[in-house]
Amino acid sequence: MRRILPLALVLLLAGAGPAPAQPALQTADLGRCRLESGAVIQDCRIGYRTAGTLNATRSNAVLVPTWFSGTSGALVGQLGPEGLVDTTRYFAVLVDALGNGVSSSPSTSARPDSTFPVFSVRDMVATQHRLLTEHLGLDSLHAVVGLSMGGMQAFAWMTRHPSFMDKVVSITGTPRLTPQDRLLWRAELRAFRATDPNGTRAAMKAVSAIHGLHLHTPEHLATMDSTDFRDFVAQREEHILAFDPHDWAWQIKAMLRHDVTAPFGGSLSRAAAAVEADALVVTVTQDHMVNPRPARRFARAMDAERLALDTPCGHLGTGCKADTVRTTVAHFLRDDP
């Protein structure tokens, strides 16, 4: 029987060495955060952690935003000499995206319900830019490195603040959603609402089944025996039920609005032409959760470095090919900051 690893362990690209010490969670108070929609998040707060040492020229900072439903605490596993971001070389800023239950979210507001303002991926990036410039005193980054929804934020960084960083790495992210992606996220929202309009945690079990179905490929799921499958379902439900239902829904709404080509009239080529940073785009050919085609097209349009992984692990293929991804990212980042 194969051991089914929890999502956090599979998705992380941590090295085989000892786990790095957990840096303290910090909070930046941004006051009012005006969103693209015109709505405002009052008492806007962003959670973050830092690791490593900022060099004398302040040129070695690397921003790592969270993936969907992830936290900065979970990102710590990517740090260290054998991790995705080597904190003996870089000053890592791990940032909690809006809606993850640490930064401003429906669950952290005075009224944790559907009255919380709807935000976008670009709004996530806007709050991160304010964190860096207003609270950490950084006017540039060496790199932005993001996985999954973090990879979507990486694409948004490329076009919203094209000259702010030297390098960008998007891993299983996308510049805009395909119809397949939209069907998935809309199905989760509708299952959530249809099962229980009030959004209780019990409704999340229906969401868990849809989510788990798309994390892997049919080929991968077919290799599970009955015990593997029970463990897989139990671990998926444990992960999802631990997350606030409204936070889950609001981050989905942000992804459904994600399209970095929108400010460029929907033109992918115009959006790609605006990118100034060097870029590395990592995709999984058999990703059923984030369709890799837009990322590949965008990468070709901006002549970015590309790594395509062919693995039945699907969206979690970066975990199954962790050594390849770590080596490629480390080499890409290694230019002296």
Language-model features: where?
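Conserved hydrolase catalytic core segment
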Residues: 139-179
